[in-house]
C-alpha cells in the first residue's frame, strides 16, 4: 500500500483519488468525460479526497498505515512532525490493553458499538463515521493512533486527539472490498494513558456490477511490465460511458488497448449488457519492491458518492525465475451452454540459463479445465513473454462452485526455480432459456399462404432474473419474419416463463430453407433463438464419376452390358422426412437402397468407394432425419436391341413425389483391353518401366474415351496419354490409348533400397541424409548392408510383387479393366560374369580380361573400380561379400595384392557437373560415369609378380547399389627354355671345337677349291615351362641370326608349346683372328623374355696365321685403292691452286694500297680535311675498277668487305649466314655484276652505284641501326675483317652505335652485350682467327687505289640530279619501320615516281619533327638505329640545321666559322650526351663525308639537298619512312644521288632540304654520344690516340700486314666523306632512342670508346665519337656513295655541326678530357696498339697545329685519310678488338659491308664492332634481304638468320660502300680472299 499522511481518508483512498491518470489516461478521461479542463477534472476526482482531508484535519496529528500483519502507528507530537513509534505486533497491543484495564469498565464509548458495512461491491468503497465518547468527568483521553490489520478497511485520523471529559471525537472508516465474501477486522486505538481500545468492523464483498476486479498478487521481474486489460461490463440497459479514469501515478500508466495515442468517445462507450476492454493498465517495474497503486474509474452512471477504485499490487523482484504475464486467468462469466473459453498462458524466464517447462496442470484437478501444453524451453533473459499453454474452461463441465476457481501450476526442470502458480476463476451461470421448438418452425407451401403469427414464450431456469433488452433478426430471415409486440426490456424472473414477442411469418414463393437464429440480448449475455423455414423437399444428386448430377445418364451401353449408377438423396429440412417408397419406370432398370447416414455432400463423395460395395436391398422405406442422406443404386441391364432407352426413378414422401429421369443408349459391340494383363519388366527405384495400353473396339461406331484411372491407391502406378493418342477409338481396330508407368521411387522418396547421392571430392561434405563420397569408401559395406537389408525386408514381405488395376471408361462402355503387374528387383551394373579367370601369365607380361558394365537406371551412375587392397580393413567384409554375391569359393583371397589393375582407354573422358571426372583418379582407381542405359567395358590387367595363383576382389563402387564385386583369379608363371638340355646363363656353354682335321685346307698348297672352314652343330631347344613360348628373334651378341662367325640356319620365328622342343642348326665360320670365340646366343620371346646362352668356339692356336692367309681377298679391294689415290692427288693440286689464287687476292689490294699511300702527298695541317684532295691523288681508273657498286658506301668506294657484301641495303648475302651481324655477308662477284648491270641502267654505272650505295647508305646506314645488328655485325666483322677494315668498320660501327635504338623486344641474336663490358676489351674473337691479317689487308689494298677516283667521281656526280637508277627508289619499304625492324623481312622494293615520293616527303614535312620523333620512338622497340625521329633533346639542333639548310643559299663560309660551329655543336652534343643515355650505334662508315664548304654548296643545289641535312635526313628519313610507313625512304637517299635525280626525285628519293625538313636529323646524329662509362671521354681519348697514331700509321704504310682479322674499316677520311671525328661522333653519339640494352644511361657505349675498352675496335670507338654535325658524317648511314648522298651527309646532322658544315672535325670534341678514360691528346690506341697521330700522319693530312680540341673538332672537316690510319699494326697477329660489348655499330659493319672476311661467314658476321646480332645492319639482312636494303627497316630488328642471297636487287639498296674496293670485280675472283661465303656462318 502506498503510504500517505493526512486525515480523513485512508491511504488507499487518498492515493486513488489524488493522482490523475497517466499520460494516456488524461486525454482519455477528458474525451470520455466531455470537455473539461484538467484542473476541473482533477478537482472533481478529488471529491472523496477532500472529504477525507477535512476529517484528517480534525484528527490531531496522528495517522496510521496498516498492512496484513504490522501496525505502524504514526503520532503527531507537539512540533507537528509525524514521528514513527515502535511498531508492535498485534498481540502486544492486546496484552497491554488487557493488563491495564483488566476488571475495569471501558473508559471510552464507541458509537456505533461496532461497524457493519453490510454488502459492498468489490472495488467500490463505502465510508462510515465512528464517534468516540469520553464518559469520564475527570480524565482527558489522549488518542495516539489508530490502526488495522487488513487492507479491506481504512481509517482516517481523529477529529481531535484529546477527548475532554464528557467530550467526543470522530474518525472515518472506509471499506474497500477486494474479494467477494465476508470480511471483518479490529481497529486498534492507542491512547497515551489508557491503553489500547479495540473496535470491530464488518463487511461483505459482493461481485462488482461492472465485473471489475482488483489486480492483486502480480509478480514480475525488474525491468519487465505488467499490463492487464481493464474490461468493464455494462449492467445497465442503456449504454455506459466511461467518463474518467485515473491512476495513482508512480510506475502505473494507463494506455489504450489498441496502443494508440487517442481515440473517439465511442472507445469508452459500452453497449447495454456487454463487456468491453476500455483501457490497459501498464505497470513498468524499475526497482525491486512491493508496489501498490490505484485506478479510479468514473462513468456516466456514477453518482457523486459512487466510486470505482481498483487496487493494483505488484511485487517486483530481482530473483531469477519464471513469471506470468497475468496475475490471474479470468474466464469471466460463462453459461453452461456456452462453448469452452480459451485463454493463453504466457511466461517469461528472467534467469541466465534456458529453462525447460515440464508440466502445466490445474491444481486441484478440475474436469472443467483443459490444458493444451507441449514441452517448451524458455530462453534465458528474453524480454518478451512466450506462449506456453492454452487453458480452456468448459462451463458445461463445472458442476459445483469449487470448479469455478483454482490454480494453474507450472513446473520447470530447473530445481532452483520454485513452481509458478497462476490462479484462475470463472463465473458460471447455471441455467437456460427454454422455448417451444415448434413455435419457430415454418413450412413453405407450394402456393403462397397467409401470414402466420406465433407468440414466443421463454422460460428462465437461471437463479436470477433475465432481462431481455433487445431482439435481432438475421438478415436472411428479415424477408419473411418480423418481430411484433416486443417492449423492451422484458424481465423474466427465475424459474418463470413469460411472453416475449410475436413472430410474424410471411411465406414467399421462392422455396428456400432458412436455418438461422434470432439474437436475444439479455443481462446474461446473448442467447440464440433458432428459427427454421423448410419446404419438405428432398435434394438429390448423381454421384461421380457422372458429370450430370440432375439425371441418371448411362451413356452408350453395349447390348450385353449392365451398368450401375449411384445417386444420393439429402434431407436438408429442419424436420425429419419419411421416404415411403421408391420405384422405377422403364424396362431393364432396378433400384436398391445402399446406405443411410448423417452427413452432407462432401461426406457422400468421400464415402463413394464404400457405397459402391454396400447394399441394403431388403428395405422398402426409410426415414431421414434432418441432415441425413440416403444413397440408392440404379442398375440398367441392356437388352439385345440397339437404341435409346429412357426411364425414371420415383421417390415418395409426405411432401412430394421426386422423379429422377434415366437415359441410356444401347449399342451392339464391346471394348476390351489388350493385353488384359500387362506385365511390366522388373524395376527398382531409379528405373521407370512402362508398357502401352491398347483397347480393341468391336463396335460399329467410334467410341470416345472419357476416363482412364487407376483403381488402386499405389502412386507408383500411373498412366500418361500420348500426344498421338486420339480420344476416339476407331471401330474394328485396336488403338493405343496410353502408357502405363511404374516408378518405384515415388513411394520411397529419399529412403529407397537402392540409389544414393554421390559427392565428388570437390563438393562440400555437408549434406543431409546418407550419401556416398568419392574419396571415402571404408563405410561402403555398411551402406551396402543397410540398403540390402531394406531390399530383403521388402522381398520377405512379398512387397516386391505389385499390381494395380486400371479402368477405362468410354461413352459406349464403362469399366474396361486392365490388370498391371510390376516387380521390384535388386539391380546390378555388372553385365558380365562376376568371376574373371586369367590365363597363365608370364611374370614379365600382362594378360587382360574385360568387364562389361551397363547402367540399368534412368539416372547417371557414378562408378569407381577399387582394388580390395585399398580398403583399410577388407577382412571384415570379404567373406560376407563373397557369400552375398555368390562368388565361387577360392582357397584364399589376397587382401593386399595390387596385381590386378582396371583401366579403360577413353578418348573423351566425361566429367560430371559436380566435378567427378572419368579416368584414373589416383593410383589404381578407375572412375566411370554411366549414362542412363549406357554400356561400357573396362579391362582388367593381370600383371603377376610371382609364380603363384592370386585371387582377389575388385570392388565396383557405385551410387546405385554402393558395392558390387568381381572375383579375379590369375596365375603367374615364367617362360623356361633349355638349349641342349642346358638352362640359360653363363654356365650354359654351347661348344664349337674346330680341330686341326677341319683345318686341313689351310695347309693345302694346291687350293683346288675354296677352303671351307664352317662347323655345323644342331641343338635341341626345349620349352620346359607351362607357357607357350613364341621365339621372336635369335641374336648373336646383338646381331640378328648371325654375327662374329656364328649363324643360325633356321632363324625364323617359331612357337614352342609347353614341353615341346625343336632343333636349331648353328654354323660357325672362323675368321682366324682369335683362337677362342665366345659370344652370346640370345632367344627373345614376344613377351619380352630373353634367354641367353654362351657360344664357345675354339681353334688350334698354331694354325691361326696359316688359315688366315688361306682366306680369299675381296675382289673390289684393288679398284678402291686406285680410286682413292686419284682423288687425293686431285685434291692436292686443287689446294695448291687455291692457295695461289688466295695469295694473289691478298697481294693485289695490298700492292694497290701501298702505291696509293706512296702517291698520297702530305696534308696541310691547317687545311680542312678534304676527301676530294685525297681522292684526286689516286687515279680514277681505280674507281672504275672498283665500280663502286651500289652496295659501296661512300667513304671508300669499297673497303674490302663492301664488295663482298650484298649491298648495304639489300643485304642479300651470297653466304648462308643469317646472323644480323652477318648482314655484311660476302657478296659474290655475281652480286657485283648484277649491281653494276642495274647501275648501268641509270646515267652511269658509277652514278647508279653511288646512288644505290648512297641509297643503301641511307638504308643501310639506317641499318646501322640496331645495336643488335651492329654488335652482331661487329662480331662478325671483327672476326672476318682485318685490323684496318676493323678500324673502318669501327668508324662505321661507331656510327651504328648511335643508331642503336634500344629494342628490348628484339634481343640481339648474339648475346654480346651492347653495353660496354670491360672483359670485352680483349680482342674480339674472330670467326676465323687463323687469318686475321688477310681480311684487313685485303680490304686495304682494294680501297687505296680506288678511293681517289671514286671520290672524284662522286664529286662530279654531285652536280647531276639527273637520273640515278630508279633502283635507288625501289628500296622504299612499303611497310613501316617496325615491320622491317621486327620481322627482318626484306623490304619490298616499290618503284615510286619521284612525285609520289616527294608528296610523301611533304606529308612527312607536315609532321613536326616532334611527331617524327614520336613515330620513330613508337616504332623503335629496341634499338632502331635508322629511325628518323630526332632525339627530343637534339630536336632543336636538328630543326636549326634543317631551318638553316632550307633557308640558306649555300654560301661558302670560312673554315673558322665552321670550326666554331662545330665546336658549339660538339658542346651541345656533349650536353645532350650527358642528358640522354643512348646506345651508341656507330652508323656505317659508308656515310659520305662532305667538307663544310661543299656541304653548303650542296645545300644550295637546286635539289635543295643541304648535304649535312641530306645525310641525316637520308638516314633519318629512311627511318621515318619505315616508321611512318610512308615513302620517306627517299629521304635516306644520299644527296649525291639526289643530284643525279630530277628535283622531284631528289625530294622523293634523296634527302633534299625539304626531305630534311620532313625528317629530323637522324637520331644518331642528333643524339649525344651515349656514354657507357664516360663515352665522351673515351671518344676523346680515341681521337687523341688517333692523333698520336702517326708512327703507327707510318709503320702501317710500310707494313700493311693487318694484325686484326676484323674487317678493314675504311679510314674515316674516306668514310662517305664523313670526317673522322664525325664518325667518332656518330658512333659515340647515340640516338636518343638508343638505349643500351643493359640500361646504362648517359654513358657512351664502350663500342664508341677505346678499342681496348668497349670491346669494339678502336675504329668503332672513333665512329662512336663521330661528329653528328650536319656537316660531319654524323651518322654516315651505312656509307653513302658520295658526300652528296643524303645518307652520309644526313648523318652529319649531328648537333655538333648544326650549321650544316660537312666537316665536323675529324676529332670532334666528343671525348671529355675529364672523363676517366681520358688519354693524352695525341695518344691513340688502334686496335690495342697506341700510336701518335700528330706526327707524320697529320702532317700528311695537312694538320698545321697540334691536335687540341679545336683541331680535333676540325678533324670532321678532313675528308680523306689514308686507310692505313685504321690498320692495326702488323705486330698484332690477332686484332686486339675487344668484342664490342657496348655499341655494336652496324654502321661500321655496313660500311665495311659484306666484307667476306675470312673469318666472318657473313661479311662481318660477327662484326668486330658489333656484339649485337641485329639484322639492322645494312648488310645483316640475312633473313630479310630487302629489309636490310632499307637499313632503316632492319635497323632495330635482329633479323632472323636467313641466308641472304645476293641479287641485283641487293645492289639497288646498297649504300655507296667505300669498302667496295674489295668487292669482286670482273677480273678478280673475289676481293676478299677469304670470302665469307666460303665458310659456314658462325652461328
From Swiss-Prot:
Residues 1510-1526, 1542-1553, 1678-1690 have a biased composition (Polar residues). Belongs to the TMEM131 family. Glycans are attached at residue 300. Residues 1302-1316, 1602-1611 have a biased composition (Pro residues). Residues 1330-1343, 1353-1364, 1395-1417, 1436-1458 have a biased composition (Basic and acidic residues). Residues 1139-1883 are cytoplasmic. Residues 109-283 are annotated as: PapD-L domain. One of its GO terms (cellular component) is membrane. Keywords: Glycoprotein, Membrane, Phosphoprotein, Signal, Transmembrane, Transmembrane helix. The gene is TMEM131. Residues 1198-1580, 1593-1656, 1670-1712, 1766-1789, 1832-1858 are annotated as: Disordered. Changing residue 1590 to A: Does not affect TRAPPC8 binding. Possesses a PapD-like (PapD-L) domain similar to PapD domains involved in assembly and secretion of bacterial pilus components. The PapD-L domain can bind collagens and is probably involved in collagen assembly and secretion. GO terms for molecular function: collagen binding. This is Transmembrane protein 131. InterPro entries: Ig-like_fold, Ig_TMEM131_2, Ig_TMEM131L_3, Ig_TMEM131L_4, Ig_TMEM131L_5, TMEM131-like, TMEM131-like_Ig_dom2, TMEM131-like_N. Collagen binding transmembrane protein involved in collagen secretion by recruiting the ER-to-Golgi transport complex TRAPPIII. May play a role in the immune response to viral infection.
Amino acid at each position: 500500500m502506498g503510504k500517505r499522511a493526512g486525515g480523513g481518508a485512508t491511504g488507499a483512498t487518498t492515493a486513488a483519488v489524488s493522482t490523475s491518470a497517466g499520460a494516456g489516461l488524461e486525454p482519455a478521461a477528458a474525451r470520455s468525460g466531455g470537455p473539461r479542463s484538467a484542473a476541473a477534472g482533477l478537482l472533481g476526482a478529488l471529491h472523496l479526497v477532500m472529504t477525507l482531508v477535512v476529517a484528517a484535519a480534525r484528527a490531531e496529528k496522528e495517522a496510521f498505515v496498516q498492512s496484513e500483519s504490522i501496525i505502524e502507528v504514526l503520532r503527531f507530537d507537539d512540533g507537528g512532525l509525524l514521528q514513527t513509534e515502535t511498531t508492535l505486533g498485534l498481540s502486544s497491543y492486546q496484552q497491554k490493553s488487557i493488563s491495564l484495564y483488566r476488571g475495569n469498565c471501558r473508559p471510552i464509548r464507541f458509537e456505533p458499538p461496532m461497524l457493519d458495512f453490510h454488502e459492498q461491491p468489490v472495488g467500490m468503497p463505502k465510508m462510515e463515521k465512528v464517534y468516540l465518547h469520553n464518559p469520564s468527568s475527570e480524565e482527558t483521553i489522549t488518542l495516539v493512533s489508530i490502526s488495522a490489520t487488513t487492507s479491506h478497511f481504512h481509517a482516517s485520523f481523529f477529529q481531535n486527539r484529546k477527548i475532554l471529559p464528557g467530550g467526543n471525537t470522530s474518525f472515518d472508516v472506509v471499506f474497500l472490498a477486494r474479494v467477494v465474501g465476508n470480511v471483518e477486522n479490529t481497529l486498534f486505538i492507542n491512547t497515551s494513558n489508557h491503553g489500547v481500545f479495540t473496535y470491530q468492523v464488518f463487511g461483505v464483498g459482493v461481485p462488482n456490477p461492472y465485473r471489475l476486479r482488483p489486480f492483486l498478487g502480480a509478480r514480475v521481474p525488474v525491468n519487465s511490465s505488467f499490463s492487464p486489460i481493464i474490461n468493464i461490463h455494462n449492467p445497465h440497459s442503456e449504454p455506459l460511458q466511461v467518463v474518467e479514469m485515473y491512476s495513482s501515478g508512480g510506475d502505473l500508466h494507463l494506455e489504450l488497448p489498441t496502443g494508440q495515442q487517442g481515440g473517439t468517445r465511442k472507445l469508452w462507450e459500452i453497449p447495454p449488457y456487454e463487456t468491453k476492454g476500455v483501457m490497459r493498465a501498464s505497470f513498468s517495474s524499475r526497482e525491486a519492491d512491493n508496489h501498490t497503486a490505484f485506478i479510479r474509474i468514473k462513468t456516466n452512471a456514477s453518482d457523486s458518492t459512487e466510486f470505482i477504485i481498483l487496487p493494483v499490487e505488484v511485487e517486483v523482484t530481482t530473483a531469477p525465475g519464471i513469471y506470468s504475464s497475468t496475475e490471474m486467468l479470468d474466464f469471466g462469466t460463462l453459461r453452461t451452454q456456452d462453448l469452452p473459453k480459451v485463454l493463453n498462458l504466457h511466461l517469461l524466464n528472467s534467469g541466465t540459463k534456458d529453462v525447460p517447462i515440464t508440466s502445466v496442470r490445474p491444481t486441484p484437478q478440475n474436469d472443467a479445465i483443459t490444458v493444451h501444453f507441449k514441452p517448451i524451453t524458455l530462453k534465458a533473459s528474453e524480454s518478451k513473454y512466450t506462449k506456453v499453454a492454452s487453458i480452456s474452461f468448459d462451463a458445461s463441465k463445472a458442476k459445483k462452485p469449487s470448479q469455478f476457481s483454482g490454480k494453474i501450476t507450472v513446473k520447470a526442470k530447473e530445481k532452483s526455480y520454485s513452481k509458478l502458480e497462476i490462479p484462475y476463476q470463472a463465473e458460471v451461470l447455471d441455467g437456460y432459456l427454454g422455448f417451444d421448438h415448434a413455435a419457430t418452425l415454418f413450412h413453405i407451401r407450394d402456393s403462397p399462404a397467409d401470414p402466420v403469427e406465433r407468440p414466443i414464450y421463454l422460460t428462465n431456469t437461471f437463479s436470477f432474473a433475465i432481462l431481455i433488452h433487445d431482439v435481432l433478426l438475421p438478415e436472411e430471415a428479415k424477408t419473411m419474419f418480423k418481430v411484433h409486440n416486443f417492449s423492451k426490456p422484458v424481465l423474466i424472473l427465475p424459474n418463470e416463463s413469460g411472453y416475449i414477442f410475436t413472430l410474424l411469418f410471411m411465406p414467399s414463393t421462392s422455396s428456400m430453407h432458412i436455418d438461422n437464429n434470432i439474437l436475444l440480448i439479455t443481462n446474461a449475455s446473448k442467447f440464440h433463438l433458432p428459427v427454421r423455414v423448410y419446404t419438405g423437399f428432398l435434394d438429390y444428386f448423381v454421384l461421380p464419376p457422372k458429370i450430370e448430377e440432375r439425371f441418371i445418364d448411362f451413356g452408350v451401353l453395349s447390348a450385353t452390358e449392365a451398368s450401375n449408377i449411384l445417386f444420393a438423396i439429402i434431407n436438408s429440412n429442419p424436420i425429419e422426412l419419411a421416404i415411403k417408397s421408391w420405384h422405377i419406370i422403364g424396362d431393364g432398370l432396378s433400384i436398391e437402397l445402399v446406405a443411410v447416414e448423417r452427413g452432407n455432400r462432401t461426406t457422400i463423395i468421400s464415402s463413394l468407394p464404400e457405397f459402391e460395395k454396400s447394399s441394403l436391398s431388403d428395405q422398402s422405406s426409410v426415414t431421414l432425419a434432418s441432415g441425413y442422406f440416403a444413397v440408392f443404386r440404379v442398375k440398367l441391364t441392356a437388352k439385345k436391341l440397339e437404341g435409346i432407352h429412357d426411364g425414371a426413378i420415383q421417390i415418395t414422401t409426405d411432401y412430394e413425389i421426386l422423379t429422377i429421369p434415366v437415359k441410356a443408349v444401347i449399342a451392339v459391340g464391346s471394348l476390351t483391353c489388350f493385353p488384359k494383363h500387362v506385365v511390366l519388366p522388373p524395376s527398382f527405384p531409379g528405373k521407370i518401366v512402362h508398357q502401352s495400353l491398347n483397347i480393341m473396339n468391336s463396335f460399329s461406331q467410334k467410341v470416345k474415351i472419357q476416363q482412364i484411372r487407376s483403381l488402386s491407391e499405389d502412386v507408383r502406378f500411373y498412366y500418361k496419354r500420348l500426344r498421338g493418342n486420339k480420344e476416339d477409338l476407331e471401330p474394328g481396330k485396336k488403338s493405343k490409348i496410353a502408357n502405363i508407368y511404374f516408378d518405384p521411387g515415388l513411394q520411397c522418396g529419399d529412403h529407397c533400397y537402392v540409389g544414393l547421392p554421390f559427392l565428388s571430392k570437390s563438393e562440400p561434405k555437408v549434406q543431409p541424409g546418407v550419401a556416398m563420397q568419392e574419396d571415402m569408401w571404408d563405410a561402403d559395406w555398411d551402406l551396402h548392408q543397410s540398403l540390402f537389408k531394406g531390399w530383403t525386408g521388402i522381398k520377405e514381405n512379398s512387397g516386391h510383387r505389385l499390381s494395380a488395376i486400371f479402368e477405362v471408361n468410354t461413352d459406349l462402355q464403362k469399366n474396361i479393366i486392365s490388370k498391371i503387374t510390376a516387380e521390384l528387383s535388386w539391380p546390378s551394373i555388372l553385365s558380365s560374369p562376376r568371376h574373371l579367370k586369367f590365363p597363365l601369365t608370364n611374370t614379365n607380361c600382362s594378360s587382360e580380361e574385360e568387364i562389361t558394365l551397363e547402367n540399368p537406371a534412368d539416372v547417371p551412375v557414378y562408378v569407381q573400380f577399387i582394388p580390395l587392397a585399398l580398403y583399410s580393413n577388407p577382412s571384415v567384409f570379404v567373406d560376407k561379400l563373397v557369400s552375398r554375391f555368390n562368388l565361387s569359393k577360392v582357397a584364399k583371397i589376397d587382401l593386399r595384392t595390387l596385381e590386378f589393375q582396371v583401366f579403360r582407354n577413353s578418348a573423351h573422358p566425361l566429367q560430371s557437373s559436380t566435378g567427378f571426372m572419368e579416368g584414373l583418379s589416383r593410383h589404381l582407381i578407375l572412375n566411370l560415369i554411366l549414362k542412363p542405359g549406357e554400356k561400357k567395358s573396362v579391362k582388367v590387367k593381370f600383371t603377376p609378380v610371382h609364380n603363384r595363383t592370386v585371387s582377389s576382389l575388385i570392388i565396383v563402387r557405385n551410387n546405385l547399389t554402393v558395392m558390387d564385386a568381381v572375383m579375379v583369379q590369375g596365375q603367374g608363371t615364367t617362360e623356361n627354355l633349355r638349349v641342349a638340355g642346358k638352362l640359360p646363363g653363363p654356365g650354359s656353354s654351347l661348344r664349337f671345337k674346330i680341330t686341326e682335321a677341319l683345318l686341313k685346307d689351310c695347309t693345302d698348297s694346291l687350293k683346288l677349291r675354296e677352303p671351307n672352314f664352317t662347323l655345323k652343330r644342331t641343338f635341341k631347344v626345349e620349352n620346359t615351362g607351362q607357357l607357350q613360348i613364341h621365339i621372336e628373334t635369335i641374336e648373336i651378341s646383338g646381331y640378328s641370326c648371325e654375327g662374329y662367325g656364328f649363324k643360325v640356319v633356321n632363324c625364323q620365328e617359331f612357337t614352342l608349346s609347353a614341353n615341346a622342343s625343336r632343333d636349331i642348326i648353328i654354323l660357325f665360320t672362323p675368321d682366324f683372328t682369335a683362337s677362342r670365340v665366345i659370344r652370346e646366343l640370345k632367344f627373345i620371346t614376344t613377351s619380352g623374355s630373353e634367354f641367353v646362352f654362351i657360344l664357345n668356339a675354339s681353334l688350334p692356336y698354331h694354325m691361326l696365321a696359316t688359315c688366315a692367309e688361306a682366306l680369299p681377298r675381296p675382289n673390289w679391294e684393288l679398284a678402291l685403292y686406285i680410286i682413292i689415290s686419284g682423288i687425293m692427288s686431285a685434291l692436292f693440286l686443287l689446294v695448291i691452286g687455291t692457295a695461289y689464287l688466295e695469295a694473289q687476292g691478298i697481294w693485289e689490294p695490298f700492292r694497290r694500297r701501298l702505291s696509293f699511300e706512296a702517291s698520297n702527298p702530305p696534308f696541310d695541317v691547317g687545311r680542312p680535311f678534304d676527301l676530294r684532295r685525297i681522292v684526286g691523288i689516286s687515279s680514277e681508273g681505280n674507281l672504275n675498277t672498283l665500280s663502286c657498286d651500289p652496295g659501296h658506301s661512300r667513304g671508300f668506294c669499297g673497303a674490302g668487305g663492301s664488295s663482298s657484301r650484298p649491298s648495304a641495303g639489300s643485304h642479300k648475302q651470297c653466304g648462308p649466314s643469317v646472323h644480323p651481324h652477318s648482314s655484311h655477308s660476302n657478296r659474290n662477284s655475281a652480286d657485283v655484276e648484277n649491281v653494276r648491270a642495274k647501275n648501268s641502267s641509270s646515267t652511269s654505272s658509277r652514278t647508279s652505284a653511288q646512288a644505290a650505295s648512297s641509297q643503301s647508305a641511307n638504308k643501310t646506314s639506317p641499318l646501322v641501326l640496331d645495336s643488335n645488328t651492329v654488335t652482331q655485325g661487329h662480331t662478325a666483322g671483327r672476326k672476318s675483317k682485318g685490323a684496318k677494315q676493323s678500324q673502318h668498320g669501327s668508324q662505321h660501327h661507331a656510327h651504328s652505335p648511335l643508331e642503336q635504338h634500344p629494342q628490348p623486344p628484339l634481343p640481339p641474336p648474339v648475346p654480346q652485350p651492347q653495353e660496354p663490358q670491360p672483359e670485352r676489351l680483349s680482342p674480339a674473337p674472330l670467326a676465323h682467327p687463323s687469318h686475321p691479317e688477310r681480311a684487313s689487308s685485303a680490304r686495304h689494298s682494294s680501297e687505296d687505289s680506288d678511293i681517289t677516283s671514286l671520290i672524284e667521281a662522286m664529286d662530279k656526280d654531285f652536280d647531276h640530279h639527273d637520273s640515278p637508277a630508279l633502283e635507288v627508289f625501289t628500296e622504299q619499304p612499303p611497310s613501316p619501320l617496325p615491320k622491317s625492324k621486327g620481322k627482318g623481312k626484306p623490304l619490298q622494293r616499290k618503284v615510286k615516281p619521284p612525285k609520289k615520293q616527294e608528296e610523301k616527303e611533304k606529308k612527312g614535312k607536315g609532321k613536326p619533327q616532334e611527331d617524327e620523333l614520336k613515330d620513330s620512338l613508337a616504332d623503335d622497340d629496341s634499338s632502331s638505329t635508322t629511325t628518323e625521329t630526332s632525339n627530343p633533346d637534339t630536336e632543336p639542333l636538328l630543326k636549326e640545321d634543317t631551318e638553316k639548310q632550307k633557308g640558306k643559299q649555300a654560301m661558302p663560309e670560312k673554315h673558322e666559322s665552321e670550326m666554331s660551329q662545330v665546336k658549339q655543336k660538339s658542346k651541345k652534343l656533349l650536353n645532350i650526351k650527358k642528358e640522354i643515355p643512348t646506345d651508341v650505334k656507330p652508323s656505317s662508315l659508308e656515310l659520305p663525308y662532305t667538307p663544310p664548304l661543299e656541304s653548303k654548296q650542296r645545300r644550295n643545289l637546286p635539289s635543295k639537298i643541304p648535304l649535312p641535312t641530306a645525310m641525316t635526313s637520308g638516314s633519318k628519313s629512311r627511318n621515318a619512312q619505315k616508321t611512318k610507313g610512308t615513302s620517306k625512304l627517299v629521304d635516306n637517299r644520299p644527296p649525291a644521288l639526289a643530284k643525279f635525280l630530277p628535283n622531284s626525285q631528289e625530294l622523293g628519293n634523296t634527302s633534299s632540304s625539304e626531305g630534311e625538313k620532313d625528317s629530323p636529323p637522324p637520331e644518331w646524329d642528333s643524339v649525344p654520344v651515349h656514354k657507357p662509362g664516360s663515352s665522351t671521354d673515351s671518344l676523346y681519348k680515341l681521337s687523341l690516340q688517333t692523333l698520336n697514331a702517326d708512327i703507327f700509321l707510318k709503320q702501317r704504310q710500310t707494313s700493311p700486314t693487318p694484325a686484326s682479322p676484323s674487317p678493314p674499316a675504311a679510314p674515316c677520311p674516306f668514310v662517305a666523306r664523313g670526317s673522322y671525328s664525325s664518325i667518332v661522333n656518330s658512333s659515340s653519339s647515340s640516338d636518343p632512342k638508343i638505349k643500351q640494352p643493359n640500361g646504362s644511361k648517359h654513358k657512351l657505349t664502350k663500342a664508341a670508346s677505346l678499342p681496348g675498352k668497349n670491346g669494339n675496335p678502336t675504329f668503332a670507338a672513333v665512329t662512336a665519337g663521330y661528329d653528328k654535325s650536319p656537316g660531319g658524317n654524323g651518322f654516315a648511314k651505312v656509307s653513302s656513295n658520295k658526300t652528296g648522298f643524303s645518307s652520309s651527309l644526313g648523318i652529319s646532322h649531328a648537333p655538333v655541326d648544326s650549321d650544316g658544315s660537312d666537316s665536323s672535325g675529324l676529332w670532334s670534341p666528343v671525348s671529355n678530357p675529364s672523363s676517366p678514360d681520358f688519354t693524352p691528346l695525341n695518344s691513340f690506341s688502334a686496335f690495342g696498339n697506341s700510336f701518335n697521330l700528330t706526327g707524320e700522319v697529320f702532317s700528311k693530312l695537312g694538320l698545321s697545329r697540334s691536335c687540341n680540341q679545336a683541331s680535333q673538332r676540325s678533324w670532321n672537316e678532313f675528308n680523306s685519310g689514308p686507310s692505313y690510319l685504321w690498320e692495326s699494326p702488323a705486330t698484332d697477329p690477332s686484332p686486339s678488338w675487344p668484342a664490342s660489348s657496348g655499341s655494336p655499330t652496324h654502321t661500321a659493319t655496313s660500311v665495311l659491308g659484306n666484307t667476306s672476311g675470312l673469318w666472318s661467314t657473313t661479311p662481318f658476321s660477327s662484326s668486330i664492332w658489333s656484339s649485337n646480332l641485329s639484322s639492322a645492319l645494312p648488310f645483316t639482312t640475312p633473313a630479310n634481304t630487302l629489309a636490310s636494303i632499307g637499313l632503316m627497316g632492319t635497323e632495330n630488328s635482329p633479323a632472323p638468320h636467313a641466308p641472304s642471297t645476293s641479287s641485283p636487287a641487293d645492289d639497288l639498296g646498297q649504300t655507296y660502300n667505300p669498302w667496295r674496293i674489295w668487292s669482286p670485280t670482273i677480273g678478280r675472283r673475289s676481293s676478299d680472299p677469304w670470302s665469307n661465303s666460303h665458310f659456314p656462318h658462325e652461328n
